[in-house]
Amino acid sequence: VSAALLAALAADLTTLHQRDLEPIDVAVLDSGVDSSHPALAGRVTSSRRVEDGQPIDVEVPGNNDTYGHGTGVASVIARIAPNARIVDLRVLRPGNKGSGEDLVAALRIAVRARIKVINMSLAAPAKFAPNLRPLCERAFYQEQMVVAARRNMPIGDDGFPAEFASVIGVGRADLPQPVSLLYTPRRSIELDAPGDAIPVAAAGGGYTEMTGTSFATPMVSAVCALLLGAFPTLRPHDMRTVLCAHGVRGG
């Protein structure tokens, strides 16, 4: 058992943000991020949109979000983890529509760049699982954390890549904000985080509240960034152990 794992197991998650933390890059694969929002001032290091499998650079600061979803997700990460540096990879187009091909391309970019935490507040259908799985496994072996949302309404599966063993899948539960976790063993998605009426930044300015697994997922990504900032040698399987150990046991 590593010293980092033991220290992380003993840590108080609610006070980690007060430590001197190493900066951790967190990729947000979503509808884009409004990096000009005050809640994200100075927190977004790069912005791209992925179209037809190709990345296109976008000016920072600026509004790369055509829907508002990704800005909300990024603001949750930024609020909880002061050491998180947001890497914006827009895979969804206006109306929150996107293609599995663009999602796979964006994940490939994040994995190749070895971004330590990859937040995916979305779920692809099973037909894209064969393309997503090897990328998630490569990330795992490169000591990157892929954190992905469970479907809000499961339809035969919980969504991909959340179902993969190499990924930290996240559901939603009625829990105190912001770093409470629920651990339910023997489920395909063992971790839940708060996901009801989460205060988030709105693209274009102002604030709103959002509900869903999409907004529970960045809470877990933020905790991963905090833990990696405090204990940089934590490995993905250690991270899962720590998250589950800190969770209230359910089921």
Q: What function would you assign to each model-found segment?
A:
Residues 60-71, 153, 208-220:
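Gly/Ser-rich catalytic serine loop of serine hydrolases
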Residues 87, 145-147, 169, 199:
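Structural detector of well-ordered beta-strand residues that form the stable sheet scaffold
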Residues 16-21, 79, 98-119, 129-145, ...:
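Mature extracellular/periplasmic domains of secretome proteins
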Residues 159-229, 233, 237:
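Extracellular S/T/G-rich loop segment that most often corresponds to the catalytic His/Ser-adjacent loop
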Residues 33-34, 94-95, 123-127, 152-155, ...:
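Solvent-exposed loop/turn segments at secondary-structure junctions
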Residues 2-84, 200, 204:
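Active-site core segment of subtilase-fold serine proteases
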Residues 59-127, 231, 243-247:
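Subtilisin-like peptidase catalytic core
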